[in-house]
Amino acid sequence: MNPINLLLLCGGGGDEHAISLLSANYFETSLAKLPHLNVLRVELDAKGQYQSKSGERCELTNRREIRFEDESLAPWPVDYVIPCIHGYPGETGDIQSYFELINLPYFGCDAEGSRNCFNKITAKMWFSALGIPNTPYLFLNQLDEQAIAQTTDALAKWGSVFVKAASQGSSVGCYRVDDAAQIPAILADAFHYSPYVVVEKTIQARELEVAVYQYRGETVATLPGEVICAGGTFYTYDEKYAADSKATTKVVAEVSDEIAQQIRAYAVKVFDGMKLRHLSRIDFFLTPEGEILLNEINTFPGLTPISMFPKMLANHGDDFSQYLNEAILTGLNR
């Protein structure tokens, strides 16, 4: 087999830049087990500047090659790219659109699937259209007195709500509201992160996650794992990634077989129904009454030391390096 030049593009310059670098470390370790790959790690910053791991300034060109600022270095042709970028521009569909424009094969969900999942409003419309239960919500498209009134009414009806920036990941721009006096300031904060905002009913429930991925010709959904937050708190960005986080996880949640199989069925249905590709982490709520509600889809899940996706894949009996190898070779028709 001829060597494959694989670009591991990471960072992105968004709110989740640092987490993307941690996930890239996991990819780098996994790819190192595949000797037919030549891997070049390049970091993309908030200004759109590229820099290789060894410090050379460079850029990805429309000719599908890395060109270096130091012209004594030969251009590096790119056969395949893994865009290890959480949040913007990696999970928003932006960078996938560019790859599609220059006909560069890449790993992960396509541009449309990424956009549809990243925007919480669009995603919930898809969930409902596919007949998958999800949390009651309303959406707002501007910060004004009407938006404040609608949110106040929702709080009165539901007792507690979450205000979420519609186009953010990892709980960025997401706030719990229990007091109407909080609403104006919290809406202002949420609209700072996104031009659209979702207001959801607070669900007192267990938080379950499923790793979904395409492997050996089928869509695989693992047994659900569980995130357990200290004192019933919300799994915030800080709780996910802080060194002193009190949140704990279980790779396999303690639920009945019936619940587990229904969650897996919903996960496969939404993955296939939204025409997602390669991998996603799909998050659910399980209420004390046994109601299952789809919460959200992460089209490029974290692969940090504390992340659930790689642990659930391994627990299912699959090897991440071999899974990657199949996806790469299939994408290159080899």
Curated annotation (Swiss-Prot):
The enzyme class is ligase
Superkingdom classification of source: Bacteria
Which molecular function terms from Gene Ontology are attached?
ATP binding; D-alanine-D-alanine ligase activity; metal ion binding
* Enzyme Commission number(s) from the entry: 6.3.2.4
Q: Where is the ATP-grasp domain?
A: 124-329
The answer to whether keyword Cytoplasm applies is yes
**Stated name of the protein:** D-alanine--D-alanine ligase
The scientific name of the source species is: Shewanella loihica (strain ATCC BAA-1088 / PV-4)
